[in-house]
């Protein structure tokens, strides 16, 4: 059975794989704002990053706490890379909307992943003084 961290990794991994597959399976994916990345490889190659990292996050969902850290690192990689590319496009003036997309990646992806990585698997309630004695 998955704990809290495992459930987060399973959801994050599934979402990342779906996002990457959306770019891979679309006949003509739109890479606007990602020119920093597409200089080095096509958008479908960068979409594979989402699929591979999503699979790693999903697979890490069933590992024990402490061993699941690589799943959280894998989950961070695609939104960090793509968010940086959108920020670059915005700062360069090529894609003004990139700043908003960067903010979205920073909060709803990276922020949530960092929060989920810090969630303890089990929380023990604090005992009242009378219960401790």
What are these model-derived regions, one by one?
Residues 106-130:
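Membrane-water interface at the C-terminal end of transmembrane alpha helices
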């Amino acid at each position: 059975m998955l704990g809290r961290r495992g459930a987060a990794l399973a959801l994050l991994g599934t979402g990342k794989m779906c996002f990457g597959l959306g770019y891979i399976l679309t006949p003509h994916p739109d890479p606007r704002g990602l020119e920093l990345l597409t200089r080095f490889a096509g958008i479908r190659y960068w979409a594979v990053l989402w699929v591979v990292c999503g699979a790693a996050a999903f697979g890490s969902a069933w590992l024990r706490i402490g061993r699941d850290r690589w799943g959280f690192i894998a989950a961070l990689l695609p939104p960090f890379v793509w968010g940086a590319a959108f920020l670059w496009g915005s700062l360069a003036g090529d894609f003004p909307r990139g700043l908003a997309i960067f903010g979205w990646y920073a909060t709803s992806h990276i922020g949530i992943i960092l929060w989920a990585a810090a969630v303890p698997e089990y929380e023990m309630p604090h005992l009242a003084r009378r219960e401790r004695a």
